[in-house]
């Protein structure tokens, strides 16, 4: 079959991609219409020049010459890639210069490679950017310098409880889980919904782009949570790189408010966000400074009890251990991490935008704290020192959790404890917390309960909690049992709202899989020589449909990027509707009338033939 020469003249100056990819073209003498000219050789035929280039390469530490005359590349000793052609001068191009660059000692005869930007060496990105601290040994080990890693300070051994028998690998200096990306999520670039007074009324069968995805406020809230979970801050050099099975410590307390002396039995404390080297998840570590432990059961026994507590209003305990990584014997208790969560103190008192306390919030907090009390007391434990700092708000509508679980039980392990008395104190602590919030709602401090202008039933509940009589969870919840129905209704409504939007996103990867299938079969090199992909072939409508969906242009020749058009076409193609469309060639000389069902069958058969 002879091709029209006028139709192949356009390819005579186009280099054949087979030459570029494979170095040869098996169709060169069998009808390939592309240019098969050999690229100019940059190597010299003189032995002196070859020897000189080999010596220069060997001096750079990347290439060695053997007895056979063949040069070999050694990646371990190579410092940088040096191409054999002329390199443009980039010295005049402005580039980012970090404030501090972490450099690793290079091997003998090698020049250290210093990148123009190192995110893990810059104070703006890396939370452990100190060069002289323990992190220097980590970078030395990662660079392959055995001498530096041999002189690194050994890691302190930690006594772990909640790792399920997992122990870190001996000699492992760098975490096996890579730190998260530092790129900022551009959620603010999404087009927001128009204000209510500008929204156009829609018919029952009409949709807007906003209705095709999750609501903007919910998406923005979830993206902010992800950003908060991955966010890190520059280290001041006083924090270790790795603590037990966790790395990437980020301080979380910034308001500098002193904790009550009785909360941690007089010990100082710190709170950090960490990344687990065991499962890659994000947790928080409550560090109690300078804790002396003499009995192994002091940590293991309380931890095992608290691990059995499973309540939506109590923060789950994940791990507990002691470590010397901070320079003292510190107790570290690991809990689940809830991004964008604040304590009740930060939510209603300390933040710049304080959330006003309402009677609805008070009833919601009361019901949830009652649920936490019931679950903790049922396991023979007590919460101890419930306060505005210990209860965190994890989301709307007013969802709270009691944190710092198991810390007090470990610190007071050796002391003679009366659990029944501590459980009665929990009721009084809940009453004092709600009393404080009620006074803040009214704007008065130290106001007697009898003179407070609040719901009489709520006032009766507070009087019961603050009284000296013995309390039980049954008597306590019986006072406001009908109020629980409102909280249950609100919680179920919110769950159905989230489930509704989740069901809409259930198959959101369906169109992505379809686009992947189209790109797998479209534009392949071997297709240019296949008669089935020519204008008279049965696969040519796939090419025209691809251009119809993604390569639209207006009357001025400007590219049109219409998301609605793409979604409409791909949805019809995925379902295989019988609707027919007209596909026109770029030169507008030919057109094809074909249905989406026929297109789908053609794409599926082509994809199956590639996978067989």
Curated annotation (Swiss-Prot):
Domain of life: Eukaryota
UniProt name for this protein: PAN2-PAN3 deadenylation complex subunit PAN3
Domain-level remarks: The N-terminal zinc finger binds to poly(A) RNA.
Region named Pseudokinase domain: 231-481
Sequence motif PABPC-interacting motif-2 (PAM-2), residues: 84-104, 111-131
Coiled coil: 482-520
Protein location: Cytoplasm
Self-association and partners: Homodimer. Forms a heterotrimer with a catalytic subunit PAN2 to form the poly(A)-nuclease (PAN) deadenylation complex. Interacts (via PAM-2 motif) with poly(A)-binding protein PAB1 (via PABC domain), conferring substrate specificity of the enzyme complex.
Gene Ontology terms for molecular function: ATP binding; poly(A) binding; zinc ion binding
Keywords: ATP-binding, Coiled coil, Cytoplasm, Metal-binding, mRNA processing, Nucleotide-binding, Zinc, Zinc-finger
Classification via Pfam families: Pan3_PK
The keyword ATP-binding appears for this protein: yes
Family the UniProt entry places it in: Belongs to the protein kinase superfamily. PAN3 family.
Residue ranges covered by zinc fingers (C3H1-type): 10-39
InterPro entries: Kinase-like_dom_sf, PAN3, Pan3_PK, Znf_CCCH
Gene designation: PAN3
